[in-house]
């Protein structure tokens, strides 16, 4: 919802709303949700105070603040029916809004990815729905950090002490954390998409939702204390489920990106039992 004074002179309202529909459909397509839901995918409000002091989720999401009583704001000078706020020009113009929307989508994840994977739907939206090349879409997905292609992100991870010592990525929620608010925290999914196609990622999330709706355990947080039907620990089970969606063993790729199996032997046996083989595509990418 926006003030009438911002939009009464718009001459492109139809194309604007069509682009909003494309962006929201992209979120649903990637994550395996129906395009028509019982609520809007994203409901934004500009004239409700944000009591948190930080950006966040909500229905409505209130991350674009406007105080109608503060006449020093540029919005008052632009109250000519043709305001230039990003959401009135380009629905994908602010990646932060999609980061917060990602939290609201309740997508499954590896525990440490809580502030990382939520950026990934933006990559699909810009690449598939709006035609950006893959690297450009990935670069834009973390807002101002536009110099990180997937390959540059790999270098950004490989130069760390943890990578050189063969350790998992740091997930300490300190200044040393290597997942949150960083491309390298979700680049594994970009690699899966560019190596095996977007369909592999979409198939995974679709199955996650089907399993969740059927009361089969899936990991939606870092405290996965239930047992899995495959008998694996949470990390290993998710690696197996991702591998099934891609049709190949993703363990080496996910290991490269700092998520290590809990029980390598049990995971390898489950991978073999699922009829999944090693991938020369992954091998070639890792030794490239």
What does each model-identified segment do?
Residues 19, 23-26, 30, 207, ...:
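Residues that form generic nucleotide/phosphate-binding pockets
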Residues 112, 116, 199-203, 252:
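Short, solvent-exposed positions on alpha-helices
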Residues 224-288:
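Beta/coil-rich, acidic/histidine-enriched accessory regions frequently appended to metallopeptidases
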Residues 1-194:
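Catalytic cores of extracellular degradative/oxidative enzymes
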Residues 129, 212, 262-264:
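A short hydrophobic/aromatic micro-motif that marks alpha-helical segments and, especially, helix-coil
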Residues 44-50, 209-211, 276-278:
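Amphipathic alpha-helical surface "interface" segments used
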Residues 133-145, 199-214, 256:
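Short alpha-helical "patches" and their helix-cap loops
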Residues 124-125, 154-245, 249:
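Active-site neighborhood of glycoside hydrolase catalytic domains
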């Amino acid at each position: 919802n926006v003030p009438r004074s911002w939009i009464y002179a718009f001459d492109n309202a139809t194309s604007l709303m069509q682009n909003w529909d494309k962006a929201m459909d992209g979120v649903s397509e990637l994550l395996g949700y129906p395009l028509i839901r019982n609520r809007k995918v994203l409901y934004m409000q500009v004239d409700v105070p944000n009591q948190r002091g930080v950006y966040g989720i909500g229905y409505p999401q209130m991350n674009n603040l406007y105080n109608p009583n503060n006449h020093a704001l540029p919005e008052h000078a632009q109250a000519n029916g043709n305001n230039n706020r990003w959401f009135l020009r380009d629905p994908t113009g602010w990646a932060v809004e999609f980061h917060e929307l990602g939290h609201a989508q309740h997508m499954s994840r590896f525990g440490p990815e809580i502030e990382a994977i939520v950026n990934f739907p933006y990559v699909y939206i810009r690449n598939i729905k709006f035609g950006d090349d893959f690297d450009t879409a990935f670069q834009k997905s973390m807002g101002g950090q536009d110099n990180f292609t997937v390959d540059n992100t790999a270098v950004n991870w490989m130069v760390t002490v943890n990578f050189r010592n063969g350790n998992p990525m740091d997930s300490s929620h300190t200044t040393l954390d290597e997942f949150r608010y960083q491309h390298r925290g979700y680049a594994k999914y970009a690699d899966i998409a560019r190596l095996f196609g977007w369909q592999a990622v979409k198939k995974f999330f679709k199955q996650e939702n089907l399993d969740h709706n059927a009361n089969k355990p899936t990991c939606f947080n870092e405290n996965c204390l239930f047992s899995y039907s495959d008998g694996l620990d949470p990390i290993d089970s998710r690696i197996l489920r991702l591998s099934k969606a891609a049709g190949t063993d993703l363990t080496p790729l996910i290991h490269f990106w700092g998520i290590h199996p809990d029980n390598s032997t049990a995971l390898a046996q489950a991978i073999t039992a699922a009829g999944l083989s090693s991938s020369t595509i992954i091998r070639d990418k890792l030794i490239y």
